[in-house]
């Protein structure tokens, strides 16, 4: 097995076909990258004109991780590449995927916005602020029942105490991922945000990732981010920031109104 490392941007080096050139030249079978890279390509080349210049007949799968993969980007990549686009979730601490659609076992149905189900070796749970286990579709902190499977981090370098305090103390018997989300009725895991990205609006715990998912569905939006700001009445309010696709001519005021209405 050979790994090709590409150090550089997926656009502007010299164009939005940088990934396709590497895949074609080296007969790459699988690509692992962050959703941001594909959002950047989609913004610069929404119709895939650069993609059509290269032979990607050996390419078999795209794996997206490192941040939340919005459904619109996944669907765009599927349409363009005609191969499985797999949104999976793992952490530096775990060294390998916690949840994924495993191509080597049996491909499961894709649920856009979900990182699929826990892979063998992981028992993933959702815990609410009151320390109780969440019901299906209830938002909470994502944890993994101990012991962790082989290959995950056994401690922190010269910091055994900090390892225990940071990861194993807040939820007894569980590894705390510091990610937030929910598990649906079918066992699919939905990673919505980091725990510090949950905002409280008038007593309602809202996921910035869930709001970003809605904004990204607007046909003119290439990238978006949602943050919480202080509000005297409601505690916090969500503020959305959007970057438009290349070539959009619709005025900003109209797009803003449409985005607010969608949310």
Functional labels for PLM-detected ranges:
Residues 1, 28-33, 42-110, 123, ...:
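Gly/Ser/Thr-rich phosphate-binding loop
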Residues 3-22, 206-214:
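ATP-dependent adenylate-forming carboxylate-activation enzymes
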Residues 24, 31, 148-149, 173, ...:
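AMP-binding/adenylate-forming catalytic core of the ANL superfamily
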Residues 44, 160, 217-219:
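Acidic-histidine catalytic/liganding microenvironments
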Residues 66, 90, 116, 179, ...:
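Active-site glycine-centered loops adjacent to acidic/histidine catalytic or metal-binding residues
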Residues 107-114, 166-168:
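Short, P/G- and charge-enriched loop/turn segments at secondary-structure junctions
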Residues 117-121, 132-167, 206:
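Conserved ATP/PPi-binding loop(s) of AMP-dependent carboxylate-activating enzymes
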Residues 125-146, 185-186, 248-256:
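Conserved beta-loop-beta connector loops within the AMP-binding
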């Amino acid at each position: 097995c050979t790994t090709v490392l590409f150090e550089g941007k997926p656009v502007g080096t010299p164009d939005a076909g940088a990934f396709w050139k590497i895949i074609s030249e080296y007969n790459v079978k699988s690509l692992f990258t962050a959703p941001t890279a594909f959002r950047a390509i989609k913004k610069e080349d929404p119709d895939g004109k650069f993609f059509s210049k290269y032979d990607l007949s050996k390419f078999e799968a795209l794996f997206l991780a490192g941040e939340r993969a919005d459904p619109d980007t996944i669907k765009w990549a599927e349409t363009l590449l005609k191969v499985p686009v797999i949104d999976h979730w793992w952490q530096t601490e775990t060294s390998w995927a916690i949840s994924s659609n495993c191509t080597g076992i049996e491909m499961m149905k894709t649920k856009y916005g979900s990182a699929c189900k826990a892979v063998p070796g992981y028992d993933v749970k959702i815990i609410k602020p009151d320390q109780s286990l969440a019901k299906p579709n209830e938002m909470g902190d994502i944890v993994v029942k101990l012991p962790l499977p082989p290959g995950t981090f056994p401690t922190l370098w010269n910091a055994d105490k900090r390892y225990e305090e940071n990861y194993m103390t807040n939820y007894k018997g569980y590894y705390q991922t510091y990610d937030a989300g929910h598990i649906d009725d079918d066992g699919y895991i939905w990673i919505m945000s980091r725990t510090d990205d949950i905002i409280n609006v008038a007593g309602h715990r809202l996921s910035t990732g869930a709001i970003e998912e809605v904004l990204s569905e607007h046909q003119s939006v290439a990238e978006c981010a949602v943050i919480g700001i202080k509000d005297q009445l409601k505690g916090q309010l969500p503020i959305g920031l959007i970057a438009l696709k290349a070539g959009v001519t619709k005025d900003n005021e109209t797009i803003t109104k449409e985005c607010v209405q969608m949310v």
